[in-house]
Amino acid sequence: MFDSIIIGQYVPGDSVVHRLDPRVKLTAVFIFLVFMFMTRDPLLLTVAVLLSFGGLLASRVPLSFYAKGMRFISIIIVLTFVLHLFMTGGGEVIVELPFATIYSGGLIEGFMLAMKLAMIITIASLLTLTTTPIDLTDGMERMLAPFKRVKLPTHELALMMSIALRFIPTLIEETRTIVLAQLARGTNFSEGSLWKRLKALIPILVPLFTQSFKRAEELATAMEARGYAGGEGRTKYRQLHWGLKDSVVLAVFLLFAAAVMAERFMGG
């Protein structure tokens, strides 16, 4: 289960998605996350599917790697679909069961929400799979640059967000190691009452928090040893360059956002 979470990991490559400016990728992901949940139109949902899988294919990330990452989230997607299927009414009756009645409205709502979740995970994963931590930090810093006028520490905020995102795989690996160690000691996480199973998590959470603080302290020490003193006066070896392909990608996502807005406010 722990190996199947890919958000926060980076896959080296030289695809067109890898070469995109991190600012356009961050903006595209933000637009997609906001407007994906706003749309209820099947045609726009189809466009979102094409955008998601088009980006996945263009990134040249192995489909097997992505499929592994969807293994865990698929449980949530299926559960969401089933809950809507049995708990949402409206429309025509499809089938009547002894314990529930399935309506066409529940089927459509469940399918659309499940697809939205899958597409959001795809786009969010593409951001970290195709963007290095340094580029991600630089992109966030440049996007937050206007807030420097109100004395906001934009570089430090961008660095914290980037580090937090990149610590996800590390924490997952730490959790997996601790769980395996506890299983080797005979700990059973699946039997007993709910209270006993919650108590069994304590030997996982305590060392996990301890290791997290230890790694944070080691990272801070390493940054200080390398002379890091914040972003003031810091120069960058690699400069960000906004090109034609970045403008095209941004225009595509802005058109998607405009179409969703038109559907919401003009289509009722």
UniProtKB/Swiss-Prot annotation:
The chain crosses the membrane at residues 29-49, 75-95, 107-127, 152-172, 242-262. Its main location: membrane. GO terms for molecular function: transmembrane transporter activity. The keyword Magnesium does not apply. It is a multi-pass membrane protein. GO terms for cellular component: plasma membrane. It is found in: Cell membrane. Keywords: Cell membrane, Membrane, Transmembrane, Transmembrane helix, Transport. Transmembrane (T) component of an energy-coupling factor (ECF) ABC-transporter complex. Unlike classic ABC transporters this ECF transporter provides the energy necessary to transport a number of different substrates. Pfam families: CbiQ. The keyword Membrane applies. Forms a stable energy-coupling factor (ECF) transporter complex composed of 2 membrane-embedded substrate-binding proteins (S component), 2 ATP-binding proteins (A component) and 2 transmembrane proteins (T component). May be able to interact with more than 1 S component at a time. It comes from the Bacteria. This is Energy-coupling factor transporter transmembrane protein EcfT. Belongs to the energy-coupling factor EcfT family. The gene is ecfT. Signal peptide: none annotated.
